[in-house]
Amino acid sequence: MHVIAVDAMGGDNAPQAIVEGVNQALAEFKDIEIQLYGDEAKIKNYLIANERVSIVHTDEKINSDDEPVKAIRKKKKASMVLGAQAVKEKAADAVISAGNTGALLAAGLFVVGRIKGVERPGLMSTMPSFTGQPFDMLDLGANAENTANHLHQYAILGSFYAKNVRGIATPRVGLLNNGTEKTKGDSLRKEAFELLSQEASINFIGNVEAREIMSGAADVVVADGFTGNAVLKAIEGTGLGTMKTLKSAIMNGGLKAKLGAFLLKDRLKGMKETMDYSSAGGAVLFGLKAPVVKCHGSSDAKAVYYTIKQVRKMLDTKVVEQLVDAFDPKEEVN
């Protein structure tokens, strides 16, 4: 039985969306138990009674505008912190939150702890592509500044996840750069390119450009945290803007536009489903001693359900235990 700690108070739509997502997951997966951390009375308004769910009451929560590290240290009874503490104490196997990203990263690093040998855990998300084959990308903002050694480790981490969790036998790893030639990029990218070229444990295919990653150029895309976060937000903004523009064109385009949309209804629905990033789950702070996963702040119940499904897969495959062995065979997860 997998025990998953869930911060019920984090995110724009908490606790309703969080609890409703938990209800869906419990109904489908019989091998999970959920610990909900937060305001018990508010949680019970949406919770369907189940013997595999428990509530740990707390009135304290971390707000979106709280300074991450200070919040973790001062708000010891916050729902997010208690969830991370449960993982540290082995009362839970993983923790999920849609709350303050920086605070969750801090809780992951300072409470759960990183795997020995991993210099900087990376924030990684599985992204949709136009081909229908998702790709993993990291770092998405856990670290604003990185060295070439960090990017080297991100490539190993991302490849490991793609292989063991997503089932890709030989993941193609690409380095995000401003050109595909090996001579492109600044000193960071050039040094990282050399390190990745010499890494025998990964299938490094060279540099990839931002315009190529949505077209299936690589299974794993490696970037420094600043660049990765900027690209992620550009992708999200472009997707939302495209759908909004398309909807406006249909609604304001008269009878012909509406008729065309009706005829293309199934195609448009399929396109929307292909580009729905929520179905891939949340962003993993990979390189820690247990799964710490961030849902989007605006997550609905569907996104929460898929994140729990993702965490269940991580626990089923024992990817963290395997990662510990890969980086330091002598260390035990604790």
UniProtKB/Swiss-Prot annotation:
Question: Subunit notes for this chain?
Answer: Homodimer. Probably interacts with PlsY.
A GO molecular function annotation here is: phosphate:acyl-[acyl carrier protein] acyltransferase activity
E.C. number(s) listed in UniProt? 2.3.1.274
Matching entries from InterPro entries are given as:
FA_synthesis (IPR003664), Phospholipid_synth_PlsX-like (IPR012281)
Q: What's the catalysed reaction?
A: a fatty acyl-[ACP] + phosphate = an acyl phosphate + holo-[ACP]
Query: What protein name is recorded for this chain?
Result: Phosphate acyltransferase
How is this protein annotated for GO cellular component?
Answer: cytoplasm
Give the species this sequence originates from: Streptococcus thermophilus (strain ATCC BAA-250 / LMG 18311)
Its biological purpose = Catalyzes the reversible formation of acyl-phosphate (acyl-PO(4)) from acyl-[acyl-carrier-protein] (acyl-ACP). This enzyme utilizes acyl-ACP as fatty acyl donor, but not acyl-CoA.
Q: Name one GO biological process term.
A: fatty acid biosynthetic process
In terms of SUPFAM superfamilies, this protein maps to: Isocitrate/Isopropylmalate dehydrogenase-like
Q: What class of enzyme is it?
A: transferase
Cysteine pairs forming cystine bridges in this chain are none
**Compartments it resides in:** Cytoplasm
Query: Which pathway, metabolic or otherwise, does it act in?
Result: Lipid metabolism; phospholipid metabolism
Which PANTHER family has this protein been placed in? FATTY ACID/PHOSPHOLIPID SYNTHESIS PROTEIN PLSX, PHOSPHATE ACYLTRANSFERASE
